[in-house]
Amino acid sequence: MQFDNIDSALMALKNGETIIVVDDENRENEGDLVAVTEWMNDNTINFMAKEARGLICAPVSKDIAQRLDLVQMVDDNSDIFGTQFTVSIDHVDTTTGISAYERTLTAKKLIDPSSEAKDFNRPGHLFPLVAQDKGVLARNGHTEAAVDLAKLTGAKPAGVICEIMNDDGTMAKGQDLQNFKEKHQLKMITIDDLIEYRKKLEPEIEFKAKVKMPTDFGTFDMYGFKATYTDEEIVVLTKGAIRQHENVRLHSACLTGDIFHSQRCDCGAQLESSMKYINEHGGMIIYLPQEGRGIGLLNKLRAYELIEQGYDTVTANLALGFDEDLRDYHIAAQILKYFNIEHINLLSNNPSKFEGLKQYGIDIAERIEVIVPETVHNHDYMVTKKIKMGHLI
């Protein structure tokens, strides 16, 4: 498929056009027509109903939903993607509410600041969806994409979306979407590209605190940051004056290894080795909340159960439905840029960290090997990291 850039899509939306938004291939892997409510024209919903044929919904911000008392359709949402459907509505000035004109009127009234809850009949023929406050950075769905796109065009936070179906009633994917794009001369973007666009446009970290932190390995400055859109907390240890070319360790949090000194892995030993090195040579340790290579603590324990049954650290993650490594280093790159660090000597044995930082514009001048002893308990783990994950150990 041939995708357009986000800026061109925003321009099209602001001109009242409809675009195609495609989600992740591991999610629905489908394309929705998306329009911004404030900019859409009288033909938008008719075009969606005639050409796309899916369910026409109206994503809105939480503020709009709360102001108009748009309560959830069900108390117990069992949708596999957690889509926040509210009760369906028609504006009181409609008749049956189903015509394209009347659904357009209902959608437009959703963003009218003079509208009140009593102005909408329930149930109706338009289906509002409530977007997460942090948009696609919190949930990579079409609901959040529509509201984010509306905001990025300077419009009120609401849109209209409709799944694209083929003539035979199946969902349009891949080449079907490309053909639809070409037939109707529409812009087409991905939610992944929208996520990256927002990451580049908006600050993702917020400085919260700085303290002196005496440790068994020396006294460090400890900085606390908060990830703006995920609310994750990130700790940074530094030693000495921060330089533009700095020694840096990215360390993924490992409760079992770092705190309980588990010998299943080498994480705790790597952290101690890195703290000793940074204390002696100066530099920085960025402590990232990426437990279990991004799958979380409880899922890591589930992976350990599988390892006890004969799986290795890679196949266990795959068996649980995860990639072998879910980590992303964009937040780490943001922190480095916060400190004006342009070049780093990276303390790591993991090549994916090099590539992960390079894609966000961080220059890695040198790799510093982190040497830790192997134990009888982590031998198989170390072998798997070397053979299957390419670690330089």
Swiss-Prot record:
Tell me which residues bind Zn(2+): C254, C265, C267
Which superkingdom heads the taxonomic lineage of this protein's source? Answer: Bacteria
Record-annotated residues binding GTP?
R249, L250, H251, S252, A253, Q270, E291, G292, R293, T313, S348, K353
Write out the catalysed reaction: D-ribulose 5-phosphate = (2S)-2-hydroxy-3-oxobutyl phosphate + formate + H(+); GTP + 4 H2O = 2,5-diamino-6-hydroxy-4-(5-phosphoribosylamino)-pyrimidine + formate + 2 phosphate + 3 H(+)
InterPro entries in the record: DHBP_synth_RibB-like_a/b_dom, DHBP_synthase_RibB, GTP_cyclohydro_II, RibA, RibA-like_sf, Riboflavin_synth_RibBA
Q: Which Pfam families match?
A: DHBP_synthase (PF00926), GTP_cyclohydro2 (PF00925)
Enzyme Commission (EC) number: 4.1.99.12, 3.5.4.25
Q: Which UniProt keywords apply?
A: GTP-binding, Hydrolase, Lyase, Magnesium, Manganese, Metal-binding, Multifunctional enzyme, Nucleotide-binding, Riboflavin biosynthesis, Zinc
Q: What does the note under cofactor report?
A: Binds 2 divalent metal cations per subunit. Magnesium or manganese.
Q: Which NCBIfam families match?
A: PRK00393.1, ribA, ribB
Record-linked HAMAP family: RibA, RibB, RibBA
List the protein's name: Riboflavin biosynthesis protein RibBA
Q: What is the lineage of its organism?
A: Bacteria, Bacillati, Bacillota, Bacilli, Bacillales
